[in-house]
Amino acid sequence: MLLAENRAPFGSIYVSEKDFENSDSQAWFIATQIRYYLARITTAPFEVKANDDGNGIYISFDKDYADDEFSINTENGSLYITGGKRGVIYGGYELLEIIGCRFFTPDCEKIPTITKLEIDDINKREKPIFEFRDTDYGSVTHYLKFATQCRVNGRWNDVPEMLGGSIRYALGAHSFAWLVPHHEYRDTHPEYFSFYNGRRQNVENDHWQLCLTNPDLVDIVVKNAREILKANPDKKILSISQNDNPYNCQCENCLKSDAEEGSPVGTLIKFVNHVAEILEPEFPDVMFDILAYHYTRPASRKTQTRHNVCVRLCASSTCFAHPYDKCDDRSRAVKHPNGKTTVFIDDLIEWSKVCNRLYVWDYTSNFPLYPMPFANWRVLQPNLQTMAKHNVKGVFEEANCAANGGVDFNELRTYLLCKLMWNPDCDIDAYRKEFMEYYYGEAAPHLDKYLNMLCDFVEKGNYHLYIQDIKRPDYLSEELLITYNDLFDKAEKAVAGDGIRLSRVQKARLSIRFVDIFWNEILSGNYNAQKINQFFTDLRAHNISRLDEWSNIERTYRAWMEGKERGVYLSTPWRYDRESIL
């Protein structure tokens, strides 16, 4: 099918009369996007018009499609893109990718130049494997159009309906503090809080949970959840989940319930089921979410979730050097009340048998040491395939959430994860090759060799990789750093005449420089102020704002200069670094 030739379009881009008059509609948005990119590709002046009977590209929303579903069809000399409210947008970007466009990062797109643009006949209909797909890499959280191009549909930030909106949580996680405010009840009702270490944890600290067998708490949580949902009618998931600590209630009633259920999660499920049942008539479209996290990770053997309760299974205490189903390390297995232990794959399999709405909270970075090379490249696809195999419905890939990203090839990891969340069986090697060759140019072979060396060493040595480790891993030894630096020397030389790609290589090299400075300078006490100052100067030049999850780089810089290894030791509560950018 001919779309354009010699700067002349073969037809127009058509939307319905309703969408033509509404510049905030999804169909109008993607129609103008297609017009923009086709003009860049062909220099042909395509027009967006209201439907008529001429040949062209027809774009339409269809309520019978799932929100993220789309179809593309060529028929009788025209091309038809149809989809749900996000699907119609995804379908438009899919057409552009078929033509040869690639959306690698918010500021790196590959747009071909074609004088005679023809496409083969298309007859495809797609919807994602996972209904919920999210990551908190900065390029996705702060550039909403790019997130849409990546087909991410779960957002921390507001996404305008023009971009299809998003699936949002009213409370995202660790929500006990909002549902039963500690400061409000700690003095008058200490019995509401967890019994641990011989006392109720109603003191001002970070060690409290709720006593979920206390009958008074259901009414309090229902009241506060109702207020939150009424104030946020667009948010369709509310998390009722424990705080981020392992100090669950050890009172007699809670321990008895935990033992009967085979896991503390059973006690949590009974509580949340009760809340969800009460609120369902008023909020029939809302899903109530729990975290299967740390002590609640093992599945319950007795009480199961209601139809309007979702489980988010967290892959914490999990090795990310090997696929979930291939790792032999049980050193960080979770202990059950009866003394039995399970690793993540055990829990995933059990949850998949008893829960019909299972999400996974996955991890992709070393959170205390964001810049450290994280050799998880070869587990990204098999882990998502394992999730799909076990009927997981949604995935959140927690990452380096700094607004401007990080230095450990975060751009590549974001791109690959988004492709895999849409289709875990995609040709990930082809996507990686395309990205590396375009984003890094002639430096790509050297950088690809570096990434493969990291993974080769981890696999051959059966090394285990965790998200909170601060110890220096064997694959970052002094001897190997020499080899890695040699590869980066070659990479820089290969793009010495290409300022943009040279800058990207130098940014990636900051990861190796961090390893050298952190272990050879900071932890050893052998401070080289000039070396440290230059490192932070280069971090700022690349707009890097965080070296760990909890502190910005200025606080980390001060900590290092004061002989402290991490900025968290000077910490004040962290926040996102800037507002979202469309």
Residue ranges and their predicted role:
Residues 46-68, 74, 80:
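Short, well-ordered secondary-structure micro-motifs within conserved domains or adaptor modules
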Residues 6-12, 18-21, 25-33, 37-41, ...:
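Feature activates predominantly on carbohydrate-active enzymes
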Residues 213-219, 227, 332-443, 449:
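Structured mid-domain segments that build the active-site/substrate or prosthetic-cofactor binding neighborhood
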Residues 54, 233-236, 283-288, 307-309, ...:
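Loop/turn elements at helix/coil->beta-strand transitions in domains of secreted/extracellular proteins
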Residues 258-275, 305-325, 387, 416-426:
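Acidic, His- and aromatic-enriched active-site or binding-groove loops in soluble protein domains
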Residues 417-582:
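Catalytic domains of carbohydrate-active enzymes that cleave complex glycans
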Residues 207, 245-247, 314-333, 365-367:
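Conserved radical SAM core fold
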Residues 288-320, 371-379, 404-414:
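Substrate-binding cleft/loops of secretory-pathway carbohydrate-active enzymes
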